[in-house]
Amino acid sequence: MLNVTIQFNGNKVAADLNRELDQTVRQISQDYFDRVKAKTPVRSGRARKGWRLKKQRQFAYEVRNRVPYIGRLDEGYSKQAPRGMTRPAAREVLNQARRRYKR
């Protein structure tokens, strides 16, 4: 007679998946933050220095800039960044993530 017991430890698997997913979201958020900051035009440097990356909760990060004129810069009012910063950075990061995580 042979008895085999297979037990699935769902809590450990879920914790491992959550940890890996959080690391992936953090990396993508950091990549976006780095790119949007690098694309920000520089005159005085205030707009570029104004970028902040903050974790909101699990799997959620916020990239913000409270410089009053950042909206105009992002709309393309600078010859240094005529297409703005956020949309081009998002496109680049999305394409990079697709290549990196493609299976």
Roles of regions detected by a PLM:
Residues 1-103:
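Short, Lys/Arg-rich flexible segments
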